[in-house]
């Protein structure tokens, strides 16, 4: 500050002390939100005319706001009021508010360069910020935004009364209110927490390995390679060494063509039964029995011509949308004992029908499915195939009738195999026998219906 400003401040202070005081001290206090109030501290002696100049000229953040001598200062408090001393300041009003005028009462205490708080507030604060302090604060905030983080000495929210304020070049340097300006500490990086619940990158040096969340447990990770290999049977590893054979224990003989409707459908008689055999000298009986009890064998059935070289599943061109062989064309294995008491693996086809008359063969294909590799392999290889003997499909007039169920069929039925039992009928001898199956009932009902029609035609 120049010498001229100091002399001007000293002259102004003398003129203010010489002015008559005409306003009473009982003047109401101005609004608490628009006045910056100051109070001297009797703990220290006056510091000179420089502090008197600061008492009259206060700086606001929006510009220099000159506070005239008519404003009431905290030194003009009544006798019964005892302000608390301190080195802070309090800003009771808004930054841009204009204070109200107050007459200057007579002095009761000598002015001091130390500041105290008003009796209307209990918070401690510091003196107003000078333009240089505001510029310094703005530069610090700019450095913080640009990544340059200066190191600040630790500060306290309250200033001790025993420590006098420091001055630079004869000027009192105001302190900064730490309640209003948060201190800048050293920079700490906190990695953001994502909303999707995924852990942060483990390669980052700021991430602790103990804070990482483990990946969710998957069932595929629980099964080790050894457990997976043990869950598979030994047939997978020795398929090329084993010799699979199919023996048709019950050959199809005759069938009645069912046409192109679903109502008048007849099954192939007798129902085909195929047995799986494994012949390998390197395997014991227990190992062979284990292979035969494998539950994931699947056998499919298709129809071939009389020679057995051409697939006859497709119909003539006028009925291209339909198949010749209909019914349940796939069978699961059934492990049981035959009529001789020997255990075996059987595949039964009790629901096969042919649409057109002719001579045909049935073609059986065996496939072994591995459930573990079912998602990886689109098609499993064929183990073995077999063809039946030639059977004849008759029209409704030429069909000789159903045969009685064999001992093998009855034996498998007793053990739980899903297959129908028939007593059989012989049309050549004009004998009718009741059948406990649906096919036998349909044949008997059809014969009765035909007899009624003949009687009606004879009466007419």
Curated annotation (Swiss-Prot):
Signal peptide stretch: none
Ranges of Basic and acidic residues composition bias in the record: 423-437
Source species, domain of life: Eukaryota
Record's compositionally biased regions (Polar residues): 192-207
Predominant subcellular localization, coarse grouping: nucleus
GO cellular component: nucleus
Region of interest (Disordered), ranges: 67-131, 152-216, 422-460
Cross-referenced PROSITE patterns: VELVET
Location in the cell: Nucleus
Nucleus listed as a keyword: yes
InterPro entries named among the record's database cross-references: Velvet, Velvet_dom, Velvet_dom_sf
Positions of the Velvet domain: 239-422
Biased composition (Basic residues): 451-460
Subunit details: Interacts with VE1.
Family: Belongs to the velvet family. VelC subfamily.
Role played: Velvet-domain-containing protein that acts as a positive regulator of sexual development. Dispensable for regulation of conidial size, hyphal hydrophobicity, fumonisin production, and oxidant resistance.
Descriptive protein name: Sexual development regulator velC
Organism expressing this protein natively: Gibberella moniliformis (strain M3125 / FGSC 7600) (Maize ear and stalk rot fungus)
Gene that specifies this protein: velC
């Amino acid at each position: 500050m120049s010498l001229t400003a100091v002399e001007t401040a000293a002259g102004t202070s003398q003129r203010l002390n010489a002015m008559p005081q005409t306003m009473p001290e009982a003047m109401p206090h101005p609004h608490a939100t628009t006045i910056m109030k100051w109070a001297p501290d009797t703990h220290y002696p006056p510091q000179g005319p420089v502090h008197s100049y600061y008492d009259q000229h206060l700086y606001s953040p929006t510009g220099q706001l000159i506070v005239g001598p008519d404003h009431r200062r905290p030194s003009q408090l009544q006798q019964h009021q005892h302000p608390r001393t301190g080195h802070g300041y309090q800003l009771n009003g808004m930054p841009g508010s204009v204070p109200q005028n107050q007459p200057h009462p007579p002095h009761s205490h000598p002015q001091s360069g130390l500041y105290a708080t008003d009796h209307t507030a209990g918070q401690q604060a510091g003196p107003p910020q000078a333009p240089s302090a505001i510029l310094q604060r703005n530069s610090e905030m700019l450095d913080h935004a640009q990544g340059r983080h200066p190191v600040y000495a630790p500060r306290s929210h309250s200033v001790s009364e025993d420590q006098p304020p420091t001055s630079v070049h004869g000027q009192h340097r105001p302190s900064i209110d730490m309640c209003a300006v948060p201190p800048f500490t050293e920079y700490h990086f906190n990695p953001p927490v994502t909303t999707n619940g995924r852990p942060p990158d483990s390669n980052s040096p700021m991430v602790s390995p103990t804070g990482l969340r483990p990946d969710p447990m998957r069932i595929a990770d629980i099964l080790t390679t050894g457990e997976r290999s043990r869950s598979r049977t030994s047939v997978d590893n020795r398929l090329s060494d084993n010799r699979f054979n199919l023996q048709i224990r019950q050959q199809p003989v005759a069938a009645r063509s069912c046409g192109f409707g679903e109502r008048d459908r007849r099954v192939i008689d007798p129902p085909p039964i195929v047995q799986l055999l494994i012949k390998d000298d390197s395997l014991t009986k227990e190992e062979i029995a284990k292979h035969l009890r494998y539950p994931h064998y699947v056998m499919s059935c298709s129809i071939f011509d009389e020679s057995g070289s051409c697939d006859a599943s497709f119909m003539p061109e006028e009925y291209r949308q339909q198949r010749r062989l209909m019914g349940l064309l796939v069978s699961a294995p059934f492990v049981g004992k035959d009529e001789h008491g020997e255990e075996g693996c059987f595949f039964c086809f009790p629901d096969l029908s042919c649409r057109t008359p002719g001579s045909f063969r049935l073609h059986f294909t065996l496939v072994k499915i591995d459930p573990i590799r079912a998602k990886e392999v689109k098609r499993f290889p064929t183990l073995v195939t077999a063809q039946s003997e030639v059977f004849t499909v008759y029209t409704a007039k030429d069909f000789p009738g159903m045969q009685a169920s064999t001992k093998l069929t009855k034996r498998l039925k007793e053990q739980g195999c899903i297959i129908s039992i028939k007593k059989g009928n012989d049309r050549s001898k004009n004998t009718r026998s009741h059948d406990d199956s649906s096919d036998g009932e349909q044949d008997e009902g059809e014969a009765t219906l035909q007899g009624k029609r003949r009687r009606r035609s004879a009466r007419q």
